[in-house]
């Protein structure tokens, strides 16, 4: 993928996410997922085997469908359970704005549709392509990040003890929620 195309995708994500008021899937989340993916590329030593721009584009857009939902409990639950289906309907329209090859288009679509639910459902993609696997693991590491936990707890103080315990348990067992379980030993870098 051309760097120009990645910059257009990044700009689009910035514009869209800057308007979104949800605490769990905003611009900060997308940026953390991109940074997690960058760390993983280095740890896994795959820089020369993949198109990193294509990976980062997938990371920037992986939750773009969430900005079209209402920010309430019912809408959030619906989105959580049907995220793959919602992404499937939404992502193609988004990607048509950008000059992508057919292969780039399909790689991003596949990664975004199939990335949800490693945590808590262990719906992994170990047989998927590297773009999907890294995106899913980068998103999983953000799921257990201190920043995201603080964000969650700030709006739901009454759930703080339960959410803290839950995240602690997931962190201790993170290797079971990753396509690349060897990344678990680097948990402090994410």
Which positions does each model-derived feature cover?
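Short alpha-helical hairpin
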Residues: 1-16, 60
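Divalent metal-dependent phosphate-bond-processing catalytic cores, especially two-metal-ion Mg2+/Mn2+ enzymes
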Residues: 19-48, 61, 71, 117-190
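Alpha-helix N-cap/helix-initiation sites
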Residues: 23-26, 48-54, 101-105
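An active-site-proximal "capping" alpha-helix that borders the catalytic cofactor pocket
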Residues: 33-40, 80-97
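Inter-helical turn/loop segments and adjacent helix faces that build the functional surface
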Residues: 44-47, 94-102
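His-Asp-centered metal-binding catalytic motifs of divalent-metal-dependent phosphohydrolases/nucleases
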Residues: 50-79, 83, 87, 109-117, ...
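Internal catalytic-core helix/loop-beta-alpha segment
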Residues: 102-124
């Amino acid at each position: 993928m051309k760097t120009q195309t990645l910059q257009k995708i990044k700009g689009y994500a910035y514009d869209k996410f800057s308007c979104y008021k949800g605490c769990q899937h905003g611009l900060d989340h997308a940026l953390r997922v991109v940074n997690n993916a960058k760390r993983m590329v280095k740890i896994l030593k795959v820089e020369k085997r993949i198109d990193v721009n294509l990976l980062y584009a997938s990371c920037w857009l992986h939750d773009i469908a969430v900005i079209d939902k209402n920010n309430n409990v019912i809408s959030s639950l619906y989105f959580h359970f049907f995220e793959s289906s919602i992404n499937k309907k939404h992502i193609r329209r988004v990607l048509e704005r950008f000059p992508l090859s057919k292969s780039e288009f399909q790689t991003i679509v596949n990664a975004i549709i199939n990335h949800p639910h490693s945590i808590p459902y262990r719906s992994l993609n170990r047989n998927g392509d590297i773009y999907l696997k890294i995106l899913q693991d980068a998103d999983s590491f953000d799921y257990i990040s201190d920043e995201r936990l603080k964000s969650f707890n700030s709006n739901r103080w009454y759930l703080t003890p339960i959410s803290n315990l839950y995240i602690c348990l997931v962190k201790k067992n993170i290797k079971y929620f990753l396509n690349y379980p060897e990344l678990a030993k680097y948990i402090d870098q994410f």
